[in-house]
A protein has these predicted regions:
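Helix-to-loop junction immediately C-terminal to a conserved catalytic motif
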Residues: 64
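Conserved ABC transporter NBD signature motif
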Residues: 72-88
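Short coil-to-helix segment of the ABC ATPase nucleotide-binding domain corresponding to the Q-loop/switch region
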Residues: 105-112
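Catalytic Walker B motif of ABC-type/P-loop ATPase nucleotide-binding domains
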Residues: 169-172
Length: 271
Protein backbone atom coordinates (compact mmCIF):
# COMPACT_ATOMS: atom_id res chain seq x y z
CA UNK A 1 0.00 0.00 0.00
CA UNK A 2 1.49 3.39 -0.92
CA UNK A 3 1.96 5.78 1.96
CA UNK A 4 0.52 9.19 1.30
CA UNK A 5 -1.22 11.86 3.36
CA UNK A 6 -4.25 13.79 2.20
CA UNK A 7 -4.52 17.39 3.24
CA UNK A 8 -8.21 17.17 4.02
CA UNK A 9 -10.17 13.91 4.04
CA UNK A 10 -13.55 13.86 2.33
CA UNK A 11 -16.25 13.15 4.90
CA UNK A 12 -19.95 13.22 4.23
CA UNK A 13 -22.83 14.24 6.45
CA UNK A 14 -23.23 16.74 9.23
CA UNK A 15 -20.35 16.72 11.74
CA UNK A 16 -21.11 15.49 15.24
CA UNK A 17 -19.38 18.64 16.45
CA UNK A 18 -17.63 21.49 14.63
CA UNK A 19 -15.46 24.33 15.90
CA UNK A 20 -15.86 27.40 13.71
CA UNK A 21 -13.23 30.11 14.11
CA UNK A 22 -12.77 29.31 17.79
CA UNK A 23 -10.42 31.48 19.82
CA UNK A 24 -9.58 31.40 23.51
CA UNK A 25 -7.93 34.16 25.53
CA UNK A 26 -7.41 33.57 29.23
CA UNK A 27 -7.84 36.18 31.96
CA UNK A 28 -4.08 36.82 32.06
CA UNK A 29 -4.17 37.81 28.39
CA UNK A 30 -2.60 34.62 27.03
CA UNK A 31 -4.11 33.65 23.68
CA UNK A 32 -4.32 29.85 23.64
CA UNK A 33 -6.30 29.36 20.41
CA UNK A 34 -7.02 31.56 17.40
CA UNK A 35 -9.22 30.79 14.38
CA UNK A 36 -9.44 27.08 15.14
CA UNK A 37 -11.63 25.25 12.63
CA UNK A 38 -12.28 21.57 13.25
CA UNK A 39 -15.07 19.18 12.25
CA UNK A 40 -15.48 15.71 13.74
CA UNK A 41 -17.78 13.16 12.10
CA UNK A 42 -19.60 10.20 13.60
CA UNK A 43 -17.46 7.13 14.19
CA UNK A 44 -14.13 8.87 13.51
CA UNK A 45 -10.96 8.42 15.51
CA UNK A 46 -9.27 11.83 15.30
CA UNK A 47 -6.04 12.82 17.06
CA UNK A 48 -4.96 16.38 17.86
CA UNK A 49 -1.17 16.57 17.62
CA UNK A 50 1.01 19.55 18.37
CA UNK A 51 3.77 20.96 20.57
CA UNK A 52 3.28 21.53 24.29
CA UNK A 53 1.12 24.54 25.05
CA UNK A 54 -0.47 24.77 21.60
CA UNK A 55 -4.01 24.57 22.95
CA UNK A 56 -4.89 20.92 22.31
CA UNK A 57 -6.27 20.38 25.80
CA UNK A 58 -8.01 23.75 25.70
CA UNK A 59 -9.76 22.76 22.48
CA UNK A 60 -10.89 19.51 24.09
CA UNK A 61 -12.26 21.35 27.13
CA UNK A 62 -14.14 23.75 24.86
CA UNK A 63 -15.74 20.82 23.02
CA UNK A 64 -16.74 19.33 26.37
CA UNK A 65 -18.25 22.59 27.56
CA UNK A 66 -15.78 22.83 30.44
CA UNK A 67 -14.41 26.10 29.03
CA UNK A 68 -16.17 28.73 26.94
CA UNK A 69 -14.62 30.02 23.71
CA UNK A 70 -13.72 33.70 23.66
CA UNK A 71 -14.48 33.88 19.95
CA UNK A 72 -16.14 31.68 17.36
CA UNK A 73 -18.69 28.97 18.00
CA UNK A 74 -19.10 25.27 18.71
CA UNK A 75 -21.85 23.70 16.60
CA UNK A 76 -23.47 20.34 17.33
CA UNK A 77 -25.38 18.09 14.95
CA UNK A 78 -28.49 18.56 17.10
CA UNK A 79 -28.17 22.33 16.94
CA UNK A 80 -27.39 22.70 20.64
CA UNK A 81 -24.48 24.36 22.41
CA UNK A 82 -22.43 22.62 25.07
CA UNK A 83 -21.61 24.03 28.46
CA UNK A 84 -20.77 22.44 31.79
CA UNK A 85 -24.48 21.95 32.53
CA UNK A 86 -25.52 20.39 29.23
CA UNK A 87 -22.64 18.07 28.36
CA UNK A 88 -24.82 15.10 29.27
CA UNK A 89 -27.30 16.08 26.58
CA UNK A 90 -24.57 15.55 24.00
CA UNK A 91 -23.48 12.26 25.59
CA UNK A 92 -19.83 13.17 26.06
CA UNK A 93 -17.30 11.08 27.96
CA UNK A 94 -14.04 12.73 29.07
CA UNK A 95 -10.81 10.97 30.04
CA UNK A 96 -8.29 13.34 31.63
CA UNK A 97 -4.49 13.18 31.67
CA UNK A 98 -4.61 11.76 35.19
CA UNK A 99 -7.14 9.11 36.27
CA UNK A 100 -8.62 11.57 38.86
CA UNK A 101 -10.22 8.75 40.84
CA UNK A 102 -11.68 9.43 44.27
CA UNK A 103 -9.19 7.65 46.58
CA UNK A 104 -11.78 6.97 49.29
CA UNK A 105 -14.22 5.25 46.91
CA UNK A 106 -14.18 1.81 45.32
CA UNK A 107 -13.67 1.38 41.60
CA UNK A 108 -17.40 0.72 41.20
CA UNK A 109 -18.27 3.89 43.11
CA UNK A 110 -15.89 5.92 40.95
CA UNK A 111 -17.43 4.54 37.78
CA UNK A 112 -20.92 5.21 39.16
CA UNK A 113 -20.26 8.96 39.56
CA UNK A 114 -21.32 10.07 36.02
CA UNK A 115 -24.53 8.07 36.37
CA UNK A 116 -25.32 9.87 39.63
CA UNK A 117 -24.56 13.27 38.14
CA UNK A 118 -26.77 12.51 35.13
CA UNK A 119 -29.58 11.11 37.27
CA UNK A 120 -29.34 7.72 35.55
CA UNK A 121 -30.32 5.30 38.30
CA UNK A 122 -31.97 2.58 36.21
CA UNK A 123 -29.73 -0.43 35.62
CA UNK A 124 -26.79 1.42 37.21
CA UNK A 125 -25.16 -1.74 38.54
CA UNK A 126 -25.46 -3.48 35.18
CA UNK A 127 -23.98 -0.44 33.41
CA UNK A 128 -21.05 -0.37 35.83
CA UNK A 129 -20.39 -4.09 35.44
CA UNK A 130 -20.50 -3.78 31.65
CA UNK A 131 -18.14 -0.78 31.62
CA UNK A 132 -15.62 -2.53 33.87
CA UNK A 133 -15.79 -5.69 31.76
CA UNK A 134 -15.08 -3.68 28.62
CA UNK A 135 -11.81 -2.38 30.05
CA UNK A 136 -10.70 -5.64 31.65
CA UNK A 137 -11.51 -4.74 35.26
CA UNK A 138 -14.43 -7.11 35.85
CA UNK A 139 -12.88 -8.49 39.03
CA UNK A 140 -11.92 -5.15 40.57
CA UNK A 141 -15.26 -3.44 41.27
CA UNK A 142 -14.68 -3.42 45.04
CA UNK A 143 -11.00 -2.52 44.89
CA UNK A 144 -9.71 0.94 45.84
CA UNK A 145 -7.50 3.13 43.63
CA UNK A 146 -4.50 2.60 45.92
CA UNK A 147 -4.69 -1.11 45.08
CA UNK A 148 -4.43 -0.54 41.32
CA UNK A 149 -1.45 -0.07 39.03
CA UNK A 150 -1.17 3.06 36.89
CA UNK A 151 -2.56 1.25 33.87
CA UNK A 152 -5.47 -0.17 35.87
CA UNK A 153 -6.31 3.29 37.21
CA UNK A 154 -6.48 4.60 33.65
CA UNK A 155 -8.69 1.65 32.68
CA UNK A 156 -11.03 2.61 35.52
CA UNK A 157 -11.05 6.20 34.26
CA UNK A 158 -11.98 4.98 30.77
CA UNK A 159 -14.74 2.79 32.24
CA UNK A 160 -16.10 5.85 34.05
CA UNK A 161 -16.16 7.77 30.76
CA UNK A 162 -17.95 4.91 28.99
CA UNK A 163 -20.56 4.11 31.65
CA UNK A 164 -23.10 6.64 30.34
CA UNK A 165 -22.67 5.20 26.83
CA UNK A 166 -21.46 8.49 25.31
CA UNK A 167 -21.55 9.07 21.58
CA UNK A 168 -18.37 11.18 21.79
CA UNK A 169 -15.28 10.22 23.78
CA UNK A 170 -12.71 12.95 24.49
CA UNK A 171 -9.29 11.78 25.69
CA UNK A 172 -6.60 14.18 26.89
CA UNK A 173 -3.21 12.41 26.75
CA UNK A 174 -4.55 9.52 28.84
CA UNK A 175 -1.49 7.28 28.43
CA UNK A 176 1.31 9.86 28.57
CA UNK A 177 2.50 8.94 32.07
CA UNK A 178 2.56 5.17 31.49
CA UNK A 179 5.48 2.95 30.52
CA UNK A 180 5.75 1.98 26.86
CA UNK A 181 4.55 -1.61 27.27
CA UNK A 182 1.46 -0.58 29.23
CA UNK A 183 0.85 2.28 26.83
CA UNK A 184 0.95 -0.01 23.79
CA UNK A 185 -1.36 -2.50 25.50
CA UNK A 186 -3.87 0.25 26.30
CA UNK A 187 -3.57 1.60 22.75
CA UNK A 188 -4.66 -1.82 21.50
CA UNK A 189 -7.46 -2.04 24.06
CA UNK A 190 -8.70 1.41 23.09
CA UNK A 191 -8.76 0.50 19.40
CA UNK A 192 -10.68 -2.69 20.20
CA UNK A 193 -13.23 -0.66 22.19
CA UNK A 194 -13.54 1.89 19.41
CA UNK A 195 -14.12 -0.79 16.79
CA UNK A 196 -16.66 -2.70 18.86
CA UNK A 197 -18.59 0.28 20.24
CA UNK A 198 -18.19 2.62 17.22
CA UNK A 199 -17.76 5.70 19.37
CA UNK A 200 -16.47 8.97 17.99
CA UNK A 201 -13.07 9.65 19.58
CA UNK A 202 -11.04 12.85 19.78
CA UNK A 203 -7.63 12.00 21.23
CA UNK A 204 -4.96 14.50 22.32
CA UNK A 205 -1.34 13.35 22.20
CA UNK A 206 2.24 14.65 21.89
CA UNK A 207 3.36 11.39 20.32
CA UNK A 208 3.68 11.06 16.56
CA UNK A 209 3.97 7.29 16.94
CA UNK A 210 0.82 6.98 19.05
CA UNK A 211 -1.18 9.25 16.75
CA UNK A 212 -0.25 7.23 13.66
CA UNK A 213 -1.03 3.92 15.36
CA UNK A 214 -4.45 4.95 16.65
CA UNK A 215 -5.90 7.44 14.22
CA UNK A 216 -7.86 7.63 11.03
CA UNK A 217 -7.12 11.35 10.86
CA UNK A 218 -4.46 13.50 12.52
CA UNK A 219 -4.97 17.22 13.01
CA UNK A 220 -1.58 18.93 13.31
CA UNK A 221 -1.68 22.20 15.26
CA UNK A 222 0.68 25.18 15.31
CA UNK A 223 2.37 26.49 18.46
CA UNK A 224 0.34 28.88 20.60
CA UNK A 225 -1.94 30.45 19.62
CA UNK A 226 -3.06 27.10 18.31
CA UNK A 227 -4.81 26.63 14.99
CA UNK A 228 -4.99 23.82 12.45
CA UNK A 229 -1.84 23.66 10.33
CA UNK A 230 -2.81 20.59 8.31
CA UNK A 231 -4.78 17.36 8.51
CA UNK A 232 -3.42 13.95 7.50
CA UNK A 233 -5.35 10.76 6.82
CA UNK A 234 -3.77 7.49 7.96
CA UNK A 235 -5.02 5.14 5.26
CA UNK A 236 -4.13 1.88 7.00
CA UNK A 237 -6.70 -0.84 7.69
CA UNK A 238 -8.03 -1.89 11.08
CA UNK A 239 -7.52 -3.84 13.23
CA UNK A 240 -3.96 -2.63 13.76
CA UNK A 241 -1.43 -4.60 15.76
CA UNK A 242 2.28 -5.21 16.20
CA UNK A 243 2.61 -6.11 12.52
CA UNK A 244 1.50 -2.58 11.58
CA UNK A 245 3.90 -1.00 14.07
CA UNK A 246 6.81 -2.81 12.44
CA UNK A 247 5.70 -2.19 8.85
CA UNK A 248 7.21 0.11 6.25
CA UNK A 249 3.84 1.87 5.95
CA UNK A 250 3.88 2.77 9.65
CA UNK A 251 7.43 4.10 9.42
CA UNK A 252 6.47 6.12 6.36
CA UNK A 253 3.42 7.64 8.01
CA UNK A 254 5.50 8.53 11.08
CA UNK A 255 8.00 10.36 8.87
CA UNK A 256 5.21 12.26 7.09
CA UNK A 257 3.54 13.27 10.33
CA UNK A 258 6.88 14.23 11.91
CA UNK A 259 7.66 16.42 8.91
CA UNK A 260 4.22 18.05 9.14
CA UNK A 261 4.71 18.71 12.85
CA UNK A 262 8.14 20.23 12.24
CA UNK A 263 6.67 22.45 9.52
CA UNK A 264 3.86 23.52 11.86
CA UNK A 265 6.35 24.47 14.56
CA UNK A 266 8.43 26.36 12.02
CA UNK A 267 5.37 28.22 10.74
CA UNK A 268 4.44 29.18 14.28
CA UNK A 269 7.91 30.45 15.09
CA UNK A 270 7.94 32.51 11.92
CA UNK A 271 4.59 34.17 12.50
Amino acid sequence: MPVHPTASPTLSGTPVVALDGVGKTFANGMVALERLDLAVHAGEFVSLLGPSGCGKSTALRIIAGLSAPSRGRVAWADGGAADARTVGAHRIGFVFQEPTLMPWATVAANVRLPLRLAGLKADASARIDAALARVGLAGFAQSYPRELSGGMKMRASIARALVTEPALLLMDEPFAALDEITRFRLNNDLLALWQSLRKTVVFVTHSVFESVYLSQRIVVMTPRPGRVFTELTIDAPFPRDESFRTSADYAGYCRLVSDALAAAIGAGEGS
